[in-house]
């Protein structure tokens, strides 16, 4: 999954570095 602030699930599964 890609980092997406609009999608909590995708956002959580993203690497911590990409969460920013």
Curated annotation (Swiss-Prot):
A GO CC annotation recorded here is: membrane
Extract the GO molecular function terms from the UniProt entry: toxin activity
Q: Where are the transmembrane segments?
A: none
- Tissues in which the UniProt entry reports expression: Expressed by the venom gland.
Record localization = Secreted; Target cell membrane
Q: Which UniProt keywords apply?
A: Membrane, Secreted, Target cell membrane, Target membrane, Toxin
Q: Which family does it belong to?
A: Belongs to the three-finger toxin family. Short-chain subfamily. Type IA cytotoxin sub-subfamily.
Role, per record:
This three-finger cytotoxin shows cytotoxicity and direct nephrotoxicity. The cytotoxicity has been observed on B16F10 melanoma cells (EC(50)=2.56 uM) and on kidney proximal tubular epithelium LLCPK1 cells (EC(50)=4.79 uM); it is due to necrotic cell death and not to apoptosis. Direct nephrotoxicity has been deduced from binding to LLCPK1 cell line and to kidney membranes. In addition, after intravenous injection into mice tail vein, the toxin principally accumulates in kidney, but only minimally in blood, liver and brain.
Instruction: Tell me the subunit arrangement.
Output: Monomer. Homodimerizes during storage at 30 degrees Celsius (observed after 3 days).
Report what the protein is called: 7.2 kDa cytotoxin RVV-7
Give the organism, scientific name: Daboia russelii
